[in-house]
């Protein structure tokens, strides 16, 4: 039962919580010095994120309802499952975090705070074709 699960205040390492679709009643650590992977969540209602994270995977979310991202996330924020950005509040500054929003079906309601444009990834980048390298041996 997740409601009775307890974590230490600070986790030094990655935390993966799988097989749950809701975070209602879940008490996470105050700080995760690593990655927090909750990709199985389909709703963020009731989710209270740690005050500090090195990365966040919530690729199962299809709606941002209830999601409150804080500024103190330094790695990748994977929200690639979101279909809509309506109501999504992005962090107002980045400590190097890149925010994946590659699943959006429309950009309606998407507000990217000033200075955050370089950190938001809206579409998968096509791999660039490799050019052959010619080496002349004498």
Model segments located where?
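Terminal non-domain segments
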Residues: 1, 134-138
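Concave beta-strand-loop units of leucine-rich repeat
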Residues: 1-2, 12-22, 28-43, 48-63, ...
């Amino acid at each position: 039962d997740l409601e009775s699960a307890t974590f230490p205040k600070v986790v030094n390492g990655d935390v993966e919580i799988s097989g749950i679709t809701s975070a209602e009643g879940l008490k996470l650590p105050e700080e995760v010095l690593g990655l927090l992977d909750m990709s199985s969540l389909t709703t963020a209602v009731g989710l209270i994120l740690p005050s500090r994270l090195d990365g966040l995977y919530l690729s199962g979310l299809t709606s941002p309802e209830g999601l409150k991202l804080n500024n103190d996330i330094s790695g990748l924020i994977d929200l690639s499952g979101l279909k809509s950005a309506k109501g999504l509040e992005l962090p107002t500054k980045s400590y190097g975090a890149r925010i994946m929003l590659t699943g959006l079906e429309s950009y309606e309601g998407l507000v990217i705070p000033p200075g955050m444009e370089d950190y938001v990834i809206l579409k998968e980048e096509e791999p660039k074709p490799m050019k052959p390298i010619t080496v002349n041996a004498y």
